[in-house]
């Protein structure tokens, strides 16, 4: 029996989502709080887990071609990780990360 892990999809994080992650790290002060670092690490792990189950999370109500992870605890700390699945290429592209309390996004916000 092989212990190799099969990865079905490659997860790519867009430049926009990388900036979102960096800003979020600063916003929650993860450099100075162990709890914030654990929360942030959990968010990043949820993104990595998309390589195995990209269709687990629901489609967004803004655009049916997009999906989102809802990460955190309600009501104050839920973040949305907006992504799309490029099925033919077996790629999950993370496009944007935003606080769940923010207004709906426009697809033009994802650039």
Residue ranges of model-derived segments:
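A short, surface-exposed loop/turn module that caps and links secondary-structure elements
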Residues: 45-75
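Enriched for short, Lys/Arg-rich terminal
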Residues: 2-4, 71-111
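Arg/Lys-rich, positively charged N-terminal/basic patches that mediate binding to nucleic acids
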Residues: 1-42
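Residue-level recognition of specific faces of alpha-helices
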Residues: 20, 27, 46-49, 68, ...
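A general secondary-structure boundary signal
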Residues: 9, 20, 68-71, 84
């Amino acid at each position: 029996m092989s212990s190799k892990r099969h990865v079905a999809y490659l997860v790519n994080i867009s430049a926009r989502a990388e900036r979102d992650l960096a800003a979020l790290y600063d916003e929650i002060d993860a450099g100075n709080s162990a709890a914030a670092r654990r929360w942030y690490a959990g968010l990043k792990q949820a993104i990595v887990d998309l390589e195995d189950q990209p269709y687990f999370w629901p489609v967004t109500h803004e655009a049916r071609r997009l999906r989102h992870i809802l990460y955190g605890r309600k009501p104050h700390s839920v973040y949305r990780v907006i992504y799309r699945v490029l099925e033919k290429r077996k790629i999950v592209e993370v496009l944007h990360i935003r606080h769940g309390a923010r207004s709906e996004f426009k697809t033009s916000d994802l650039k």
